[in-house]
C-alpha cells in the first residue's frame, strides 16, 4: 500500500519548485534562525564546537543554541534520517527549546536539527561530525524534508 503525504500528483521536484516561488523562496532566502546564525559562526571560524569523549559535540552544540540538556525526550519512532539506527534499545533523544530541536542517536555521527525561522518557518539541518578528525559540517536542508514524501507499507 502506498501513502502519499502532501499532494499525490506532485513529485518532489515540482514541490520544491513551489517552495522557491514568492513569497517563500526557500532556497534563496537566508535563514535568520539560531542554527543558521551558528552555521555562519562555524563556517567563518569564529566558533569551534568542543568535543566531549562520551557525547562528541552534542553538549557544546546544545550550549551554543541555548537548548537545555534537561529538556529532552526519548523517542523510538522511525521519523528520522537515521531510522536504521533507532530501536527500543537505542532510542533517539530530542532536545528542545522554544525555537530549536536537536535529534541525537547514540552511535551516530549525524545530528538532526530543526529551527523556527521568522520568515521561512521550520528549517532543517544536519550536523555531520567526522569521528576521526575535529571536522564537522552543519548543512541546511535544501527543501527535501518539506516536499511530499511517499511511504510504502
Model-derived segments and spans:
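Sequence context surrounding c-type heme c attachment/ligation sites in exported
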Residues: 104-153
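N-terminal low-complexity, intrinsically disordered segments
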Residues: 82-105, 114
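Bacterial N-terminal signal peptides
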Residues: 1-4
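Conserved small-residue
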Residues: 10-81, 91-93
Amino acid at each position: 500500500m502506498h501513502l502519499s503525504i502532501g499532494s499525490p500528483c506532485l513529485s518532489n521536484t515540482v514541490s520544491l519548485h513551489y517552495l522557491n516561488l514568492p513569497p517563500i523562496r526557500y532556497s534563496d532566502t537566508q535563514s535568520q534562525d539560531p542554527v543558521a546564525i551558528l552555521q555562519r559562526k562555524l563556517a567563518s571560524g569564529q566558533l569551534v564546537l568542543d568535543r566531549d569523549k562520551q557525547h562528541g559535540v552534542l553538549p557544546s552544540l546544545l550550549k551554543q543554541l541555548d537548548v537545555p540538556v534537561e529538556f529532552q525526550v526519548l523517542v523510538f519512532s522511525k521519523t528520522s534520517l537515521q531510522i536504521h539506527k533507532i530501536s527500543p534499545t537505542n532510542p533517539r533523544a530530542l532536545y528542545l527549546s522554544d525555537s530549536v530541536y536537536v535529534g541525537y542517536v547514540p552511535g551516530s555521527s549525524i545530528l538532526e536539527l530543526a529551527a523556527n525561522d521568522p520568515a521561512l518557518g521550520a528549517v532543517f539541518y544536519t550536523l555531520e561530525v567526522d569521528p576521526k578528525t575535529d571536522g564537522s559540517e552543519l548543512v541546511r536542508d535544501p527543501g527535501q524534508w518539506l516536499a511530499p514524501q511517499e511511504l510504502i507499507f
